[in-house]
């Protein structure tokens, strides 16, 4: 039972760390977990890319380089302040949203 509690606590702490990283990199200025703002909700991104083998690599590139045309007319700006490791971590967190 203690191991399960520790695993749940660790997962929650990791999720909070990823949310904090998303805030610190200004992702949350345009995105939210459960609702569309300027950009799509993270839950919608996770649903759209579910089961796609190249989703992580595609989204990491989009986080860093920006992109347009996937979710409507508003382009996602490039984010050169986000490292590749940070982008991978953020994308994994986004893709885990349900």
Segments and roles (model prediction):
Residues 29, 37-49, 62-91:
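Axial heme c-ligation environment in periplasmic c-type cytochrome domains
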Residues 16, 52, 56-57:
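Domain-level signature for proteins that mediate thiol-based redox and metal-cofactor handling
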Residues 2-11:
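Bacterial N-terminal signal peptides
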Residues 16-33:
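Sequence/structural segment immediately N-terminal to covalent heme-attachment motifs in c-type
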């Amino acid at each position: 039972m203690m191991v399960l509690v520790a695993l749940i606590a660790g997962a929650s702490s990791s999720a909070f760390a990823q949310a904090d990283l998303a805030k610190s990199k200004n992702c949350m200025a345009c995105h939210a977990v459960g609702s569309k703002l300027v950009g799509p909700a993270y839950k919608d991104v996770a649903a759209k890319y579910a089961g796609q083998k190249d989703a992580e690599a595609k989204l990491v590139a989009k986080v860093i380089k920006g992109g347009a045309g996937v979710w409507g007319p508003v382009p996602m700006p490039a984010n050169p302040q986000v490292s590749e490791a940070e982008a991978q971590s953020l994308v994994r967190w986004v893709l885990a949203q349900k």
